[in-house]
Amino acid sequence: MLRKLLIGTALATSFAFSAHAADVKEVQMLHWWTSGGEAAALNVLKGDLAKEGFAWKDVPVAGGGGDAAMTALKAMVAAGNYPTASQMLGYTVLDYAAAGVMGDLTETAKKEGWDKSVPAALQKFSVYEGKWVAAPVNVHSVNWLWINKAVMDKIGGTEPKTFDDFVALLDKAKAAGVIPLALGGQNWQEATMFDSVVLSTGGPEFYKKAFNDLDDASLKSDTMKKSFDNLAKLVTYVDPNFSGRDWNLATAMVIKGDALVQVMGDWAKGEFHAAKKTPGTDFLCYRFPGTDGSVIYNSDMFGMFNVPDDRKAAQVALATATLSKSFQSAFNVVKGSVPARTDVPDTDFDACGKKGIADLKKANEGGTLFGSLAQGYGAPPAVANAYKDVVSKFVHGQIKTSDEAVTELVKAIDDAK
């Protein structure tokens, strides 16, 4: 569908560049990094490019899941108004590449050795038909708990190793009058948490079969029903005002001690960093119970568009800066993620960052590095959107039982394929 829309409009507007063109010394970037921690991380890149003489033009679109930004991007591209680059996730990069609107960074990639330094799991989404079309910025993982240490100490809690341990910990917080679980009631947040629940409930092989291979038997299984039951249990620990809450506001609840824990990707750590909080002293980072040894990942990519020749120098400068070792370290320290290349030392990273880097290496080597279905790395966008919709309806009571949820999930994914 995207290919049909964009090919037609790209042909119709192939001469529209001059009317919409950015300044040749300007990097025009569409993104959804609008929270405090995200903006601070992006400033690292802006500063690096400024040193090279390139101005930065933001096209920010708020919304942590990126849905609104992708709607804006589709409109821009359909109008022939290509940005220098856009923040994108996994399969979306491949969709735009298939539509023929992406640039070609292969010469830059060869010159700078990206083939050797960028993990194969990321190259699957940044290389299309042998051409580099995107620059990976980071690797995030979603199966994390972010815990307020003062609240944890107050209730006498310890790291939960199993799902039952986690429920017992949430019960302690509830008994102490603290909101146990901070959640934003948006479909991508709910589905991101469910990614971790499914991995915890079914184990690594089950997660891969269900959410990466889209195996019908796994999606229909009793294990999936149990996963929905476990999700329903977690939702009982959420405050009644969660619906529509932005993810960073849920993180702020933990930072302030209004809530004990948030289940969220490691971009949440950027908010703790922005609030001048220190791991081990102010907050704790644990893997979601039952998922240690596995990593559910996503990666922010800068998809590079087929801009006119006079704008390509700015694009190459952006790509080069993005995958430089110095930027990969400085940016990911602030963002909460880990580098998108394997040869960046962990020297400047805090305890959570060091754990993230070590976990990623272990999972990559052990075959337990899995794409997040909620975050656009498990399956194409139509499937991911169908998944998020079903999970959200279950969380908000529109789907009543786990049996019904499994039936709806199987149907939605089949229809989206």
From Swiss-Prot:
Subcellular location field: Periplasm
Entry-linked InterPro entries: Bact_solute-bd_prot1, SBP
GO terms for cellular component: periplasmic space
Coiled-coil residues: none
Keywords: Periplasm, Signal, Sugar transport, Transport
Residues of the signal peptide: 1-21
Similarity comment: Belongs to the bacterial solute-binding protein 1 family.
PANTHER family recorded: ARABINOSE-BINDING PROTEIN-RELATED, BINDING PROTEIN COMPONENT OF ABC SUGAR TRANSPORTER-RELATED
Free-text function comment from the UniProt entry: Part of a binding-protein-dependent transport system for a sugar.
Name assigned to this protein: Probable sugar-binding periplasmic protein
